Amino acid sequence: MAEERGEKRGRRRDRENPRDRDDESSELVDKLVGINRVAKTVKGGKNFGFAALVVVGDQKGRAGFGKGKAREVPEAIRKATEEAKRNLVRIPLREGRTLHHDGNGRHGAGKVVLRAAPPGTGVIAGGPMRAVMEVLGVQDVVGKSLGSSNPYNMVRATFDALKGQANPRTVASKRGLKVQDIVGRRTDGASEAGMADSVN
């Protein structure tokens, strides 16, 4: 009897999981970063297709990217979107609007610099970086690309910079300090930087 009950519970969970996944997917926002025409040389000639790059996020601190290839554009976008959903990562955000600290990212020849910004700054970043920030839910940030303008390299470099973000609680626990000590230092540093800018 106990085994039968366990099996029934397992079946119920299996039935509930797809619904939960559907609800989660419905909350995600996707953006098409770029699409290219590709060709594969085979014995009989060339097979042409399309490669799509898509970023997906819930605008609450989770985002991912994916790349898909297919003969038709819609199918390539669908594959890229599905891959992006499987690659979702959570990025800690300060006040749910900006980054906790500045960061650098790199992938191949792509290099990006991301800087936390005060309220009202907006998203000062172009192209692929802006798409990533919008699906992630970042409202105030300054981003700059210093390397390759290849969309794929820029997206990978942006995520490399984002994955380096650390929550003040995590940093405080590792250093044996209080959260207020970490936040206080950050505030003091920002005020000093503001004073230096005003003097210059």
Curated annotation (Swiss-Prot):
Pfam families: Ribosomal_S5, Ribosomal_S5_C. It comes from the Bacteria. Residues 28-91 form the S5 DRBM domain. Keywords: Ribonucleoprotein, Ribosomal protein, RNA-binding, rRNA-binding. Residues 1-22 have a biased composition (Basic and acidic residues). One of its GO terms (molecular function) is structural constituent of ribosome. GO terms for biological process: translation. GO terms for cellular component: small ribosomal subunit. Residues 1-26 are annotated as: Disordered. SUPFAM superfamilies: dsRNA-binding domain-like, Ribosomal protein S5 domain 2-like. Part of the 30S ribosomal subunit. Contacts proteins S4 and S8. Belongs to the universal ribosomal protein uS5 family. The N-terminal domain interacts with the head of the 30S subunit; the C-terminal domain interacts with the body and contacts protein S4. The interaction surface between S4 and S5 is involved in control of translational fidelity. With S4 and S12 plays an important role in translational accuracy. NCBIfam families: rpsE_bact. This is Small ribosomal subunit protein uS5. It comes from Hyphomonas neptunium (strain ATCC 15444).
